[in-house]
């Protein structure tokens, strides 16, 4: 009876450890995804800030190209 109890406790401990490890991995993936979204948003803001001063020139160039 003692061996069965020990095996059951060992099995439950391994399952618990596995579930906790999976949870940590999932949280890590979510954190990396959030960081990736933040980096992407920051890059878009930086791109727009650099593009704005040149926007009127780009529009004029396109308009001149259309006029021929």
UniProtKB/Swiss-Prot annotation:
One of its GO terms (biological process) is vasoconstriction. The keyword Secreted applies. GO terms for cellular component: extracellular region. Residues 1-20 form the signal peptide. Kasstasin is a derivation of Kassina, the taxon of origin, and the Ancient Greek word 'stasis' meaning 'stoppage of flow'. Peptide with potent vasoconstrictor properties (EC50=25 pM). Has moderate antimicrobial activity against Gram-positive bacterium S.aureus (MIC=55 uM) and against Gram-negative bacterium E.coli (MIC=110 uM). Not active against fungus C.albicans. Has weak hemolytic activity against horse erythrocytes. This is Kasstasin. The lineage of its organism: Eukaryota, Metazoa, Chordata, Craniata, Vertebrata.
């Amino acid at each position: 009876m003692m061996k069965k109890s020990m095996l059951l406790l060992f099995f439950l401990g391994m399952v618990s450890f596995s579930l906790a490890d999976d949870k940590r991995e999932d949280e890590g993936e979510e954190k990396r995804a959030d960081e990736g979204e933040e980096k992407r948003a920051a890059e878009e803001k930086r791109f727009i800030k650099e593009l704005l001063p040149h926007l009127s020139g780009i529009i004029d160039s396109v308009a001149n190209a259309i006029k021929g």
